[in-house]
Amino acid sequence: MIESWVLIREQSVDEEALRSLSLANAKHLVLGSVSGSGVILHVAANSAADLGNALGKFSEVPGVNEVLTLAIQNR
């Protein structure tokens, strides 16, 4: 399992749009918003490839400007 903390930088994304995103082999938890910066997520995936796919899906959400990985832990 690989886990990551992610910052979603956005202009006007509803947190519910991020919460309801369906990821194939990964699970995510919206931890909350950071004033002026975006939304922090925790993502757990089966493999590095699955994590990459999940990050790609987040980047496709309308209004998302950047998807930044803050930390990665491989368990």
Where would I find each of the regions flagged by the language model?
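A compositional/biophysical signature of low hydrophobicity enriched in polar/charged and small residues
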Residues: 1-75
